[in-house]
Regions:
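Glycine-rich, basic loop-to-helix element that forms the pyrophosphate-binding segment
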Residues: 50-67, 84
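The conserved acidic donor/metal-binding loop of glycosyltransferases
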Residues: 76-80
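Short, flexible, basic/aromatic active-site loop/helix in glycosyltransferases
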Residues: 119-153
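Short aromatic/hydrophobic "clamp" motif used to bind/position activated sugar donors
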Residues: 72
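A conserved acidic beta->alpha catalytic loop
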Residues: 14, 22-32, 53
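Conserved donor NDP-sugar-binding/catalytic core segment of glycosyltransferases
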Residues: 84-124
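Short, acidic, metal-binding catalytic loop of nucleotide-sugar glycosyltransferases
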Residues: 6-15
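A short, conserved alpha-helix in the catalytic core of glycosyltransferases
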Residues: 155-156, 160-172, 179-198, 203-204
Length: 252
């Protein structure tokens, strides 16, 4: 998480604030965030709830509700942002659209070097072959691919998304009935699509570098698949158990 924040502070265009969605971390993380709050030139809002297992959808809704900005760039706490990440995302920002960016999955050895404070980002020739394109930056490519590479609505990277807060409220945010890993971002994206909010793809810039770690358990993936299928077949726009319980009057 700390490396993620520090990569935000090195952006060519800085965001207005940083909101940390903390799904039950302990005292060590709290102290790290307090240190960053003292050092950082940007406001850092720490949104925390107790550890009751994997509850990403819940903490994401709470964090989005606390965000003061109209346009939200969403990343995970295990990624590092390319220096022009914010700039490239803002270039594609458009009303009634949400954006899905790309990630580069770093191998264990490269991750280890980065954690030792060695050079970041790694040169593209050290990237896994399939991710070389994601490491390249081109305005022409970004604009050309934005609506041509959007692929399926459900092809999402929750570690690299952008959306308008009013659109999140329109579909009631993340579905908090999905409490384990798997397809929660796709379910959210399909509801936005059925509400008339279209997907754009960010290629040729705005990538994140995903630090290597073991994948989370996928125990509930089948049930989440079933929920996703219901949303698609029923063209569902709204989830009942969502962000509305955290939204204040000023956001409505």
């Amino acid at each position: 998480m700390e490396l993620t924040v520090r990569s935000i502070l090195k952006q060519t265009v800085l965001p207005d604030e940083i909101v940390i969605a903390d799904d039950g971390s302990g005292e060590e993380t709290k102290k790290a965030i307090e240190r960053l709050q003292r050092e950082c030139i940007l406001p850092i809002i720490h949104v925390w709830h107790p550890d009751e297992g994997f509850q990403r959808t819940v903490i994401m809704n709470k964090a989005i509700a606390r965000a003061n900005g109209e346009y939200i760039l969403q990343v995970d706490g295990d990624v590092l942002l390319a220096r022009n990440f914010v700039k490239d995302h803002l270039e594609l920002a458009e009303k009634n659209h949400f954006v899905c960016g790309s990630r580069i999955l770093l191998e264990p050895k490269i991750t280890e070097k980065i954690l030792k404070k060695e050079k970041f980002p790694p040169p593209f020739w050290k990237m896994p072959l399939g991710f070389v394109l994601n490491s390249l930056r081109s305005r022409i490519l970004r604009r050309y691919m934005a609506k041509r590479y959007a692929r399926s609505i459900g092809h999402m990277r929750g570690c690299n998304m952008a959306f308008w807060k009013e659109d999140v409220i329109k579909v009631n945010g993340y579905n908090e009935d999905l409490l384990q890993w798997g397809h929660e971002d796709s379910e959210f994206a399909y509801r936005m699509h059925f509400a008339g909010i279209e997907k754009k793809a960010l290629k040729g810039g705005g990538c994140v570098y995903h630090l290597y770690h073991k994948q989370a358990p996928r125990d509930n993936e089948e049930r989440h698949n079933q929920e996703l299928s219901k949303v698609i077949s029923g063209k569902v726009k709204w989830c009942e158990n969502g962000i509305d319980k955290y939204i204040t009057k000023k956001d409505k």
